[in-house]
From Swiss-Prot:
Keyword Zinc part of the UniProt annotation: yes
Name of the protein in question: Ribonuclease Z
Gene: rnz
Highest taxon in the source lineage: Bacteria
Disulphide bonds in the chain: none
Length: 323
């Protein structure tokens, strides 16, 4: 599984950071999935290997502008490029009204259908051939969700000795069983894939959080999770000065939660625009990492725009470079 940060700034962009967007794929950029779509996301995508033509679904965490203002431009650009495949948009109900209003009032149209799915439905679950997705309600000024991505249809290994012992010679049936399909033989026997195959590894699981001032809400979902991507808008001293109203997390809060939950990998993002990246800048973005490292002993990453990370099948997380 790979994910690329298209924007890591909170609220407003900076010279080096766009507002929120994240591209996720399983084994390559076809298909891929987008989590949030702040202003300028489609322009950020032009600097990556992802194409709007292969976008399978969008997952919107909440309705604040730094997470949705890029939607109309991206959707209409896909139409101008000739997209015809339907696109799933998993989002709060207001997002549909927002998109409809912009399309109607800008004399725009789409060449493909949008399938809106209410992210706030109590029984929410989405899946395709590659991923199953649930979500968790967070604590923010408006309803907000974290999305839990778990891979599906893991590769199976044939139990060849058992097949041979049961008189089933190598042939097309073996391939079907390995694909998870049950097979009906000419002699009337039904071969069940689960009886002749096994899955040798555990599914990879990633959580992508929206805005949230209470990381503990993710405690249950984090069981068995290999990567948590969570906002760290402030250092704790800034959070104390700002007060509770914005309902964001500090690096300290998230790090303490990740340590208590024994998360192996933590990636922080959504940094206040006050934090600078240039050498000598103050306050500097490295202060967020320094604060988190005081409380978290797992593998910590501070996301930057266009950083790409790969979660391997052995659950090791590392940065990759596709250039």
């Amino acid at each position: 599984m790979e994910f690329t940060f298209l924007g890591t700034s909170a609220g407003t962009p900076t010279r080096s950071r766009n507002v929120t967007g994240l591209a996720l794929c399983l084994s390559g950029p076809k298909p891929w999935y987008l989590v949030d779509c702040g202003e300028g996301t489609q322009h950020q995508l032009m600097r990556t290997r992802y194409s709007v033509m292969q976008l399978r679904a969008m997952f919107i965490t909440h309705i604040h502008g730094d997470h949705i203002f890029g939607l109309p431009g991206l959707l209409t650009s896909a139409s101008m490029l000739g997209r015809t495949e339907p696109l799933d948009i998993i989002a709060p109900p207001q997002v549909r009204r927002f998109i409809d209003a912009v399309i109607e009032n800008s004399d725009s149209s789409l060449s493909y259908p949008l399938n809106f799915i209410n992210s706030e439905a109590p029984d929410f679950y989405w899946q395709d051939d590659h991923l199953g997705v649930t979500n968790v309600a967070l604590s923010h000024r408006v309803p907000c969700r974290a999305y839990v991505f778990t891979e599906r249809n893991l590769e199976r290994q044939l139990q060849k000795e058992k097949l041979v012992a049961d008189g089933i010679e190598p042939g097309p049936q073996w391939g079907d069983l390995q694909k998870g399909k049950d097979v009906l033989l000419d002699d009337g026997r039904l071969l069940r894939s689960n009886d002749y195959t096994h899955i040798p590894r555990t599914a990879r699981k990633i959580i992508v959080g929206g805005d949230n001032d209470t990381p503990e809400l993710l405690k249950d979902a984090c069981q068995g999770t290999h990567v948590l991507i969570h906002e760290a808008t402030y250092t704790q001293d800034v959070a104390d000065r700002v007060g509770p109203w914005p309902q964001h997390s500090s690096a300290q809060q998230v790090a303490r939660f990740a340590q208590a939950t024994k998360l192996p990998n933590l990636v922080l993002t959504h940094f206040s625009s006050r934090y600078q990246s240039a050498p000598g800048g103050s306050p500097h973005i490295n202060q967020l990492a320094a604060e988190a490292l005081q409380h978290y002993k797992g593998q910590l990453f501070l996301a930057r725009d266009f950083d790409t990370y790969r979660l391997e099948k052995d659950f090791q997380l590392h940065k990759v470079d596709h250039n």
